[in-house]
Every structure is written in C-alpha cells, then in structure tokens.
C-alpha cells in the first residue's frame, strides 16, 4: 500500500488497492472501521540521513473478507482495469491443499483463492490475453513466484480447468519471484 501511495504521489500511476484478507480471522473490519486509512511511521536511515516520518496511507478503496464476502471477492476479477495482485500471506501461505475445491467459497489456501479468481477472470473476459494479471508474491520463501505458479498449476490439474485456461495463465499472467525491501514491525503500542 505504501509503495502504491508513493507511486500515486510521484507519478501518474493513479491507482488504489483492495485488501483481501487471506484467512478467515483477520483485521479487515478494523481497517474498514477507520475508513481504510492508516499511518506508516518510517524510522531509520535514508541516503545516510536519519528519518522519522509519519504518512497517512489513503490508497485502500476497501477491504474484503472473502469468507463472508465471496461474491464481492470474485467480482474483483470482473474489473477490466485490474492489473496487479500483490500478496504477503506469510511463509505458510503459498501451499497447495488438495482438499480445496473450485466450488469452495472461497478455497482455504491462498493459491486456491487466486486460481478461483484467475479462472473467473478468464471466463469473464473470454480468455482475452490483455486481461491477464501481474502477480507479485512477497512471501518470505525462496523462489516464491515459482512456488505460487506450481501450486496454481496443481489446482488447474486437480480442478480440471482445461488447456485453454492453462495456456491463458501461462501467456497472459506474469508471476514473479520477489524479495521484500524492508521489514515492517508490528503496531508500536508502547509508543502510541
């Protein structure tokens, strides 16, 4: 969110973020209760200078719990302007769970949810390759993009989603290995 905020401030990126909590128990209700606004307090060194800045992040348009708002979650795939998926579901988040079904609302695993979303997008736009998504997993595991892609292929096979969808995913969607550029500590309760 902070990176999107800065891109909006410094370029004509002009984008927003929909937060989707990856597990049933999450904090989207708290985020929604504060109008999807929060602050980032940057402390440390920037170009050799000590910094301590507080910035209100205002790029979240809404936050969803797919376990109670699955229809709204799936409708994200119908937005033609949607381009990016950025995830950080912890190291355990990128895992294939063979118990997940295409008909689950939603699948319990993150790769399962993402496959459901991608398949719905594929069907919504009739396989239009210009509607593929750019996917940046930020989970702290080696070759996170490769592992996420591997799990999606497993769901394509398990759920028998077909060669056309597999080809669309391979050709229209980019899944990249990433490395986070900073560690964000938890809420500084003792300082607030």
Model regions and ranges:
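Substrate/ligand-engaging "lid" and interaction regions
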Residues: 2-192
